[in-house]
Amino acid sequence: MSVEVMRSVIDAAEGRVPVDTLFTNAQIVDVYGQRVAPGSVAVKDGVIVGVLYDGRDDAAGTYEAAEVIDCQGRYIAPGFIDGHLHIESSNIRPAEYARMAATRGTTTAIADSHEIANVAGLDGLRFMIEDGRRAPISIKYMMPSCVPALPDEQAGAVITAADMQAFFAEYPGDVFGLGEMMNLPGVFMADPETCARIDAANQTPSKQVDGHAPLVAGKDLNAYAAAGIIADHESTIPEEALDKLSRGMYAVSYTHLTLPTTASQCRSRWSPYH
């Protein structure tokens, strides 16, 4: 945000200048306070500059606005961020996925397209990125870390650490970091190419390296975290997630932890009756 824009939004927040749009009579979803409360939301130059809750902020008055929208009790919530997904698993293009996701409140998605990369290599990633630029939401990508997933696999492409460095430079605003590191033996054995791929991500502004470490514990988990892998979405029990959190990692997904009843009633995905 430039100084000029900052001064403009501050003036609007203080009520010294009119806001562009004022949403009134809304139910505001406060995700930090974990509550829903009635109030209004003011927007200036595409920035939310003011939230006024009914009752608590009555003394502050309201905002003068070029446009007032009566929400009639509808909800206003922050845009949802899907922090990890594989769009190509759905067999639809990024723009089409985004069209449907937007109707459910998702405004940002972080995609790891290692499936198409294992088939079509960097050209597959370019297709996903270029198509995603037409989307009504923001789609960012993680560089697939394991193409192929393991050294002995016969994938449709090979993406080396040098390839990754060049691709990060080619798409600096689209590729955030390194996608889930599935080559666990490569990390545990300090394989030079595996370490070089992690280091390539460390040269990006975000330095984001995602993990994929089901049931990894003890010294192996220490090595995984020491390599700079900061997040994992494969914990299946609370103790496993806590084990990773205690080593400074982020537990990205709690789906397995919050749906135990549903999961216990489902047949195994490997069941012959599935």
Where are these regions (language model features)?
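Short loop/turn motifs at secondary-structure junctions and domain boundaries
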Residues: D30-Q34, S90, G156
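Active-site neighborhood of phospho(di)ester-bond hydrolases with catalytic His/Asp-centered motifs
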Residues: I81-G83, D112, M142, G179, ...
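Active-site core of metal-dependent hydrolases
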Residues: G177-L257
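Conserved small/polar residues in nucleotide/adenosyl-binding loops
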Residues: T255-T261, H274
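Hydrophobic alpha-helical segments, chiefly the membrane-spanning helices
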Residues: C266-H274
